[in-house]
Amino acid sequence: MFSTNKNRKIGMLIFLFVVSFIVGMLINIQRLGSLPMKLIQVEWNDTVGCVYENLDYENPSDHKYDLYVPKNLDTPESKCLILYIHGGSFNSGSKEDDDAWCKYYTSKGYVTATVDYTLQSKKGKSEEELLNASLELMNEEILSCVAAIKEQASQLGIDLTQMATCGVSAGGTLAMNYAYKNADISAIPVKFVFQLAGPASFEPSDWSLLKSIDHITTDADFATMMTGVRITDEMMASKEYLPYIYSVSPTYLVDANSVPTLMGYGLIDHCVPTQLKYPLIDALKENGVPYDYVEFPKSNHGMYNDIDKLQEFINLSLEYCDKYFDK
């Protein structure tokens, strides 16, 4: 009886500790979570700009984009587009997630936009689902969206002559992929890219967490889903899959012609493997590509715990606008 009561007390203490830890963590996230947004909050009204919502672009799933236009169109900045690409592990999120960021940069005089794109299913996947939500498809959709933005802006009397891509997490990857693959063929030429916490490569063995979230059981299926190419176990064993993985991995898209890159990563990120940023940095360095890396020493994937570093990143993004946009 004594032993049973003792075990119950120990169990209750453990339970209370866990509950206290979780509550404390949630309070801390709530306390800190609003701080990053305060850095980019603007008082938005028609003296700052206007938003054109749910505009069409050519894609197979009727995705839309939103366009943010500054009030003053008689400035060099108003000829520059900043395209924000939402994150969400490639399987969630929406263009509305980026509203505050778009309004912030529009308040600085830039045209901004945010886009919805095809997402990967979180459920059990058929072969068709594996093949039809790849990073290649997402890139093609964004390419189509930029063409639509160029046309829509022209109808509004705006001649967009250059752009930057940006994003957080999965959006950061797509921003880099777009900038490195499409800088010259984009309807609006890309001058630079800036991103936070974007995965830089997709070697399947590095991605046990994402495979678990997406209910992917084999490396071959993971590679298939990311690339849109039917990857077999035999291709995995022979390394024949590697060129396809490289084609959707920012690190391996970098060359001497790549655009300047601003990036930030948390050192205790439990979602994106922290080691993946180093080959990206090496690739930029080896190819002589201008870059800045802002390190968030106390931050996980949400980048909540280094407000000073986030402010540094935002300031640098505006410096990139001044330096790399031709005004």
Predicted regions: what they are:
Residues 77-87:
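Short beta-strand element of the alpha/beta-hydrolase
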Residues 132-154:
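Alpha/beta-hydrolase active-site loop
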Residues 257, 263-265, 269:
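Short beta-strand/loop motif that positions the catalytic acidic residue
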Residues 157-169:
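Alpha/beta-hydrolase fold nucleophile elbow
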Residues 125-127, 262-264, 275-327:
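C-terminal catalytic histidine-bearing segment of alpha/beta-hydrolase fold enzymes
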Residues 33-34, 39-43, 180-237:
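Hydrolase active-site cap/lid region
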Residues 96-114:
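Short amphipathic alpha-helix adjacent to the substrate-entry channel of hydrolases
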Residues 32-76:
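N-terminal cap/lid segment of alpha/beta-hydrolase-fold proteins
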